[in-house]
Amino acid sequence: GGGAAVTGGAVGAATGLRGAGPTPSTAQLDEWQAMVTQATEPHALAQLRTLARRGSGAAQAALGIALVDAHEPGLRDEGRSWLETAAAADSKADAPAARRAQLALGKALLLGSGDLPKDYARARALLGAAAEQGDPAAAYYLGLIYRSGYGIAADPVQAAHWFDIASRADIPAADFMLANAYRDGSGVPRDDARALALYRRAAEHELPEAVQTLAMAYRNGELGLRPDADEFHAQWIETAHALKHPVVAP
């Protein structure tokens, strides 16, 4: 189970919750997760460890997400161990926690995290499981895997399919990737109007790449737009603004 890699602070966990007690709310778990992520706060860490050891999938996922990028290698290992445990849960009650853990672990294995080596095949399996259960962020990362061919032959049709699912959930980065697909006719029929609408939507969320793409389209008269120096200038200023306020990755 996830308790195999427990490091210092375990002793204090036993004093956390007396008896079984009521299950903490999602908001409480989220708060503890944030406290552990930001400052490895001992009380929050002890509470989550106690619940995780008792088999709470939600606590296992929260603890894993909080620790997977920790500075201390022992805590990172513990985080990964809890994510593995939560991701493997197959009960209906633990399904939302399993999805969160699959996304977090899949992202870590896709992008690399600390000393964790990339493992594209495992990342694809985890993100695929979460995406099939309706997690839009997992769908976005699955789209990236198929678009770029990470550990697998590139598949533009699959990439566009998963970007479309993520885009419908209002993920600006997915809007941008799907817009590129429509612009290039990559995995979907070429459609400048659809691409333009998606670029605009991503730009409204201040995604710098989308704002910059619109600026160049106005400058060069692309995507069915007429060249427009004023619009180009306005979008260029907006690009600088967007770069100062980066969109949080899904």
How would you name each of these model-derived features?
Residues 40, 53-57, 69-71, 89-92, ...:
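Short helix-capping/linker turns of helical repeat alpha-solenoids
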Residues 34, 62-69, 102-111, 141-148, ...:
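Hydrophobic face of amphipathic alpha-helices that form TPR/SEL1-like repeat modules
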Residues 29-37, 49, 65, 84, ...:
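Amphipathic alpha-helical repeat scaffolds
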Residues 1-54, 58, 62:
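N-terminal leader/linker segments that initiate helical-solenoid repeat arrays
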